[in-house]
């Protein structure tokens, strides 16, 4: 059974509803966490990886591609993010992607990175959800999670980020307003592998 909790309104607002998954919110949230991790002075709840479907856990895979090593490729159909490596290999992560009406595709570049980023909801989101805070400082309860990689095109901020999440049960679902969300542990890992200037390719969705 799924429900919309008060916590979901406050902390899951950055993602909102997914048509195929009424709310990526579960009754027993605590089951998705196991202990804590302290990172750069912030203590956050560690993901219980046993709750994450094996296909969406970080893993080294064979991946046929024609991208330069270090390129990030996001498969919005399968909810995978690939970090391309040499010899047709990649590190694959499970991700949450944009819900219907908020999907996008094309090329971008990481032009900014932040650890424990603050969150400023965009004006269009505030219009849809006027109860949201105008700004939320970075920390363990911030919807952007432990890291954010900011996506630009031709020097312009697209408004989309690759970021962590306080809701690990949403990985593998179409849940966001266009951002790419990852487990906090995974986005910390990717953050260390993807420097400023990294090319990002978001594949077009196939109906």
Per-region residue spans from a language model:
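N-terminal pre-domains immediately preceding structured catalytic cores
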Residues: 2-207
